[in-house]
């Protein structure tokens, strides 16, 4: 459960530009320890840019702090702090096995038992145990996404950034990933999720932000979002 008053991530008045395009406009958000926060919004709203900026891959103007200190702008240092980004697109090593792809995520750990760490991932995604020796390129899209999430978890994140993890996946795979994310969050990992699939984004979140054309236009609980007429009409198909 979220720890009240214990903010892991604080972003204040963040502005990001691509050339002359103002992509993120005075974005302010907060994520508490143990919280599951979802950011919803249409394609092109700025969700990926926000995650790239948090991860140090894109420059921004504003304040980003992690556990009360300014977040460094060096991506390697950000990872060492425990902020792990699982980007859209999976980015696996196609000619490496599932096992070796997963182990690539443990590079920041000093002393660890590979088999013990892998077992945690296989408990979340049992199909990966069966696929352990297969090349990543032979996997289905859903299995590749499970490997990508598992690889991020191998770094023992304190804050896990997940960018569009269900894009193009079948409903049964989305359900498996949703269940895994709940277990991950229940184990104490703070999650910040960017997702176009709004029912998925609302399923296990504690709080939700709506980002449209680079602006945070709404913040609230999943229940408040489901009851909002604009959200219902635009993002939930009138449900």
Language-model segment annotations:
Residues 2-239:
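Glycine-rich phosphate-binding loops of nucleotide-dependent enzymes
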């Amino acid at each position: 459960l979220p720890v009240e008053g214990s903010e892991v991530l604080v972003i204040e008045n963040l502005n990001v530009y691509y050339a002359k395009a103002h992509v993120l406009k005075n974005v302010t958000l907060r994520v508490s320890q143990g919280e599951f926060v979802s950011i919803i919004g249409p394609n092109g709203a700025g969700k990926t840019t926000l995650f790239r900026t948090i991860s140090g891959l894109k420059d921004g103007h504003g304040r980003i702090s992690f556990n009360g200190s300014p977040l460094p702008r060096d991506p390697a240092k950000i990872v060492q702090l425990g902020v792990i980004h699982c980007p859209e697109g999976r980015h696996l090593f196609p000619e490496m096995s599932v096992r070796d792809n997963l182990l690539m995520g443990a590079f920041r750990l000093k002393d660890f038992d590979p088999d013990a760490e892998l077992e945690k991932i296989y408990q979340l995604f049992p199909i990966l145990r069966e696929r352990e020796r297969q090349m990543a390129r032979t996997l289905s899209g859903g299995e590749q996404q499970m490997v990508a999430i598992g690889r991020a978890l191998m770094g023992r994140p304190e804050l896990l950034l997940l960018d569009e993890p269900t894009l193009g996946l079948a409903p049964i795979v989305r359900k498996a990933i949703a269940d895994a994310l709940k277990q991950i969050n229940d184990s104490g990992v703070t999650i910040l999720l960017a997702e176009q699939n709004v029912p998925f984004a609302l399923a296990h979140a504690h709080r939700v932000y709506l980002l449209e054309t680079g602006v945070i236009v709404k913040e609230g609980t999943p229940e408040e979002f489901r009851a909002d007429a604009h959200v219902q009409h635009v993002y939930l198909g009138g449900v």
